[in-house]
């Protein structure tokens, strides 16, 4: 657990199908921890004794750390499914001596060559001593050139006081192999389970850039046959860099199995670059690159992107933020795909987990916050109007002779009549729809909550409208440009533009009926009905066509009955990830009944039932990589749909009364909202508001 191998195991890695070569003193072939996993290519490269050594268990202990079975007993190796190729290289007769086993450079070289011939991915050398001779160096060079990784222990002279020994560097044997094998050699020192350098371990020194630490202190356990040795009730543990090295060798096997595309040099790079800090930040002369961290080595590294594409993506990035019209559509959405990291390793990725709900509108709060007051003047056929915000104190403006106050101009409009039948309106920070409504003399009902809001946080920039009357009918052409922004724009600063163009025909059906029919076109640069999607989901951009009918009926004096609606058809811009076929249908509507002079002269009492803009059907038709073939280095793509139609449907009902009272404008409202924001799980929202405003 110390090195995070459980992450690899949970991902299905065990080292199965890979071979760990170990040049050492042999292995206990009868130990059930290795049952069925000792390679037939194992050999005694120093004689003809066989690989089983009854006089020394050093090689067995090394093999246990690297590859002991997952059998619910005793030791479990880092790569518990790997095949062990034991290459016995101890000089015959030396293991029985007082000084223990010795290994000649010639025999070690034979073992390394045998590992290359058997197709091993890593060779473990838990050995030490003097610098390697020319023959052994050449064998290491051949092995690393063939892609084999050489893992060698740093040495156990950390507490040595012998002037001929330098405990602050790996022993000469390890250093010489690093010099011979270069980038495919890792030297391994030892730390305790607390992550502290073991007293006995040689330090990284001048080999720090290729030096890893792994646990080599208090390593369980010594076996007798297939059973753990127990002495006086205690299990026997072992210490030494000899048992730190096979932890790294096991990690190599896990990576090689899980990611068959990796070269030896890439595996070494991964293990070194993902090591966790043990001492000073960065590479240091004690811990080298740090402590082996298998979990980090298995996590994506470097730049990441969708497999088989040039689309960048990351595990923690936001894949998309929906708009108000989409409500709870992406709740629980799953978009399984495949991502490659900087090493070309494939990972499963659920883009649905990166989808976020857009900030819900709070229509009552927005209405009550409004601090704008209109001001303007007319001169003949020209009128100029401003909306001024009292809440801002940045710019002093002279709004009228003798009037000074701290204010900000929120919007302005210029309307001019050209002849008797033609009008033109220009607006700054005013929507084209508002300009068109002004030219058409539409009297909009004043409701605080129940509207037909499109769910987009949209800020108009420039707008225009032109109207031509033909007898009892009129044609209005309007257009404008807006910014689609986020309420938290001060933090995000991201704004995308959209453009609108519309044409409407309006007329009268006698004295009691007004009607209009509009057609609209909206083009969004990077958004889809106000929603933003990352490049992994197509990146956004859409064109929406709308049909917008409306009718007002006056059945008797003072009464108004009206209905408006909008039906939209959206086509999302095609990309490599969303090549086409992404369509949405959306709608909004409102029904009004109003009475002028209901309670007092000049008042208006109204009732509205409405639905804000809602996606009725459709979504993104994505073409995402769903599998990766390491053999051919190609992705298999599949259709992955993302519905943007919410489960909830907001319905708003509001009763509103407005009148001139106490030298000001008074309004009162009672409202009820079902599924607010188009969220089916959201509780109903009901309330009321009273507002009185006056100018001073």
What is the role of each PLM region?
Residues 7-41, 49-104, 121, 132, ...:
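Subtilisin-like serine protease catalytic core
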Residues 1-4, 113, 120-124, 184-187, ...:
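C-terminal subdomain of the subtilisin-like protease fold in secreted/lumenal serine endopeptidases
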Residues 65-66, 87-90, 121-122, 216-287:
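Hydrolase catalytic cores
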Residues 437-456, 476, 491-495, 516-541, ...:
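Outer membrane beta-barrel transmembrane domains
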Residues 412-416, 464-468, 503-507, 547-553, ...:
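Residues on the lipid-exposed face of transmembrane beta-strands in outer-membrane beta-barrel proteins
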Residues 419-421, 470-473, 508-512, 556-558, ...:
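Outer-membrane beta-barrel channels and translocator barrels
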Residues 14-16, 89-182, 226-245:
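Substrate-binding/access-modulating region of protease and related hydrolase catalytic domains
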Residues 24, 32, 175-253, 257:
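Extracellular S/T/G-rich loop segment that most often corresponds to the catalytic His/Ser-adjacent loop
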């Amino acid at each position: 657990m110390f090195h995070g191998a459980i992450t690899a195991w949970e991902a299905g890695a065990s080292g199965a199908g890979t071979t760990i070569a170990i040049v050492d003193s042999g292995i206990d072939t009868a130990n059930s921890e290795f049952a069925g996993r000792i390679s037939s290519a194992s050999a005694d490269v120093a004689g003809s004794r066989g690989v089983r050594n009854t006089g020394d268990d050093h090689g067995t202990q090394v093999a246990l750390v690297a590859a002991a079975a997952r059998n619910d007993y005793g030791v479990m190796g880092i790569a518990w499914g790997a095949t062990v190729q034991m290459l016995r290289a101890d000089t015959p007769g030396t293991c029985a001596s007082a000084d223990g086993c010795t290994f000649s450079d010639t025999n070690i070289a034979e073992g390394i060559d045998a590992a290359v011939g058997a197709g091993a991915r890593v060779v473990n050398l838990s050995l030490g001593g003097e610098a390697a001779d020319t023959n052994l160096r050449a064998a290491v060079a051949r092995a690393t050139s063939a892609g084999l990784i050489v893992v060698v222990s740093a040495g156990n002279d950390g507490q040595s006081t012998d002037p001929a020994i330098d405990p602050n560097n790996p022993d000469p044997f390890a250093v010489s192999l690093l010099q011979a094998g270069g980038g495919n050699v890792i030297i391994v020192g030892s730390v305790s389970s607390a992550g502290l350098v073991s007293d006995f371990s040689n330090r990284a020194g001048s080999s720090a850039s290729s030096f890893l630490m792994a646990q080599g202190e208090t390593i369980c356990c010594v076996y007798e046959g297939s059973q753990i040795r127990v002495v006086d009730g205690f299990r026997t543990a072992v210490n030494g860099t000899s048992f730190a090295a096979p932890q790294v060798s096991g990690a190599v096997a896990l990576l090689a199995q899980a990611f068959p595309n990796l070269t030896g040099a890439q595996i070494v790079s991964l293990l070194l670059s993902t090591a966790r800090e043990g001492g000073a930040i960065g590479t240091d002369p004690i811990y080298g690159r740090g402590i082996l961290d298998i979990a980090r080595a298995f996590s994506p590294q470097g730049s990441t992107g969708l497999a088989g594409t040039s689309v960048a993506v990351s595990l923690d990035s936001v894949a998309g933020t929906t708009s108000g019209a989409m409500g709870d559509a992406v709740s629980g959405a799953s978009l399984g795909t495949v991502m490659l990291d900087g090493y070309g390793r494939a990972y499963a990725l659920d883009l649905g987990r990166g989808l976020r709900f857009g900030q819900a509108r709070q229509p009552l709060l927005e209405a009550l916050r409004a601090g704008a007051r209109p001001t303007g003047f007319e001169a003949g056929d020209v009128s100029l109007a401003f909306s001024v915000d009292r809440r801002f104190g940045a710019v002093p403006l002279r709004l009228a002779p003798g009037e000074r106050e701290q204010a900000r101009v929120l919007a302005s409009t210029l309307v001019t009549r050209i002849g008797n039948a033609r009008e033109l309106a220009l607006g700054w920070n005013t929507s084209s729809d508002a300009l068109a409504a002004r030219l058409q003399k539409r009297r909009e009902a004043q409701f605080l909550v129940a509207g037909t809001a499109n769910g987009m946080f949209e800020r108009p920039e420039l707008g225009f409208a032109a109207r031509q009357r033909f007898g009892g009918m009129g044609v209005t052409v309007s257009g404008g440009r807006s910014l689609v922004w986020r309420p938290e724009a001060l933090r995000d600063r991201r704004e995308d533009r959209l453009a609108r163009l519309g044409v409407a025909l309006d007329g009268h059906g006698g004295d009691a009926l007004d009607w209009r029919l509009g057609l609209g076109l909206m083009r969004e640069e990077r958004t889809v009905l106000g929603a933003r999607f990352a490049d992994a989901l197509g990146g956004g951009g859409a064109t929406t066509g709308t049909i917008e009918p409306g009718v007002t009926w006056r059945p008797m004096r003072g009464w108004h009955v009206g209905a408006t609606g909008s039906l939209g058809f959206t086509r999302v811009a095609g990309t490599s990830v969303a090549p086409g076929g992404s369509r949405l249908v959306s709608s909004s509507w409102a029904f009004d009944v109003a009475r002028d002079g209901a309670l007092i002269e000049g008042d208006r009492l109204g009732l509205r039932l409405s639905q804000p803009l809602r996606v009725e059907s459709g979504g993104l038709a994505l073409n995402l990589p769903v599998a990766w073939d390491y053999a051919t280095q190609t992705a298999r793509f599949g259709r992955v749909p993302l519905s943007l139609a919410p489960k909830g449907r907001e319905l708003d009902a509001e009763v509103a009364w407005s009148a001139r009272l106490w030298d000001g404008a008074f309004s009162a409202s009672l409202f009820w909202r079902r599924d607010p924001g188009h969220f089916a799980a959201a509780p109903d929202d009901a309330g009321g508001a009273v507002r009185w405003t006056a100018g001073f």
